[in-house]
């Protein structure tokens, strides 16, 4: 039996293709607004319907370099290593089993949450975990969506509730990200300078590997 102190851990997945300053700013915002002990960052495997821009290993290397100076961010490569499609519920089950003494909260953007009913076994997923939905200014969850009905049932404004129990959903307003990974890839392809959007270490990896060209 472990004697480790129970922790409040955020789980933040993404394709990170590439990881940029917007992603690192989100993590910074989360620690400022939510009493998290650490955040597990999980680079996703490329979904079957999308052609990879760069290899999974290169994305993992960029994410690792972006957060290498943080003591409170852990990079988890389990989905990158899997050859089969990775589903959020499978990853969550593994993390719950690995962290029986800790409280976990899943972190996602409002666009992803608005389509939660398209996730594999989504009804089981939401019963297993509390969720933080990061909401951009002026973005609303469509009233006709399943996600909106979930909010009617499970919405909380009490951040303390997230560290216990399950099935609670907190809407968290964050500073908007001014750039997307898609825009960065397009700019690199066109030969534009993207250094203002990337951490220096990530920019160096992209230039050194001639990625996204």
Regions found by a protein language model. Name each.
Residues 1-213:
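Nucleotidyltransferase catalytic core that binds NTPs
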């Amino acid at each position: 039996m472990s004697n480790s102190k129970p922790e409040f851990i955020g789980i933040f997945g993404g394709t990170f293709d590439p990881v940029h300053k917007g992603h690192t700013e989100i993590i910074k915002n989360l620690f400022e607004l939510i009493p998290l002990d650490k955040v597990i960052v999980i680079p996703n495997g490329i979904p079957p319907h999308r052609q990879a821009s760069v290899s999974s290993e290169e994305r993992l290397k960029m994410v690792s370099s972006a957060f290498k100076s943080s003591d409170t961010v852990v990079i988890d490569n389990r989905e990158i290593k899997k050859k089969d499609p990775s589903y959020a519920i499978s990853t969550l089950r593994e993390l719950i089993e690995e962290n029986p003494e800790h409280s976990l909260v899943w972190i996602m953007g409002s666009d992803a949450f608005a389509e939660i009913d398209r996730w594999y076994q989504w009804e089981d997923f939401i019963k297993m975990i509390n969720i933080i939905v990061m909401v951009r200014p002026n973005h609303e969850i469509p009233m006709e969506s399943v996600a909106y009905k979930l909010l009617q049932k499970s919405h909380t404004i009490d951040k303390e509730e997230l560290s216990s129990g399950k099935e609670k959903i907190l809407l968290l307003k964050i500073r908007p990200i001014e750039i997307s990974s898609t825009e960065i890839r397009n700019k690199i392809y066109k030969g534009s300078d993207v250094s203002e959007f990337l951490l220096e270490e990530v920019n160096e990896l992209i230039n050194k590997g001639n990625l996204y060209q």
